[in-house]
Curated annotation (Swiss-Prot):
Gene3D superfamilies: [NiFe]-hydrogenase assembly chaperone, HybE (3.30.1460.40). Belongs to the HupJ family. It comes from the Bacteria. This is Hydrogenase expression/formation protein HupJ.
């Protein structure tokens, strides 16, 4: 996040939490993930598109080893109910239902993650990864990305079935 984001984070708790996640994952990268072969050396750590949704902070975290959509409790918000680490949770977003895995992150607390990319070797540059993260976060929060439901099948009553009239309808629709 840039300097302007830091100013906004003073007002927006979701952006502030995104910055905290960035700092925490930078620490992890510098320590536990240093020299781990699944890390893409072209990437750094960034939080993208953090916003408040359903009383939680949601956004995308990009690291040299993953890109995840994450949901975390806001510091001054109402905490979500308990969830055992590794539990699959379904969250309704504007673009549809998304599965998250419940987890814990030191210095943050409960953080639920939906893996988008892991590992992240398909990204040659951090700019490419951030463009993907920005587009993904837009898609998750855009109801227009929902696929339209399939058309209901033509109703066939028993009389039409016995007379064979349903065949003509199927052939006409093809």
């Amino acid at each position: 996040m840039d300097a302007e984001s830091h100013d906004v984070a003073a007002i927006d708790p979701a952006l502030a939490l995104g910055l905290q996640l960035e700092m925490r994952y930078r620490e992890i990268y510098a320590t536990a993930m240093a020299d781990v072969p699944i890390c893409n050396p072209a990437l750094g750590v960034a939080a993208t598109g953090f916003r408040t949704y359903g009383g939680r902070a949601l956004g995308i975290v990009t690291t040299p080893w993953f890109m995840n959509l994450v949901a975390a409790d806001l510091p001054d918000g109402v905490p979500t109910g308990p969830a055992a680490t590794g539990t699959t949770l379904r969250v309704n977003l504007p673009a549809g239902e998304v599965e998250f895995i419940a987890g814990q992150l030191d210095a943050i607390g409960r953080i639920d993650s939906c893996s988008l990319f892991s590992p992240v070797f398909e990204f040659a540059t951090m700019e490419a990864a951030l463009e993907t993260a920005e587009e993904a976060v837009r898609a998750f929060f855009d109801p227009a990305t929902l696929e339209p439901p399939p058309a209901p099948p033509a109703a066939v009553n028993r009389r039409d079935l016995l007379r064979g009239h349903f065949r003509g309808r199927e052939e006409a629709s093809e």
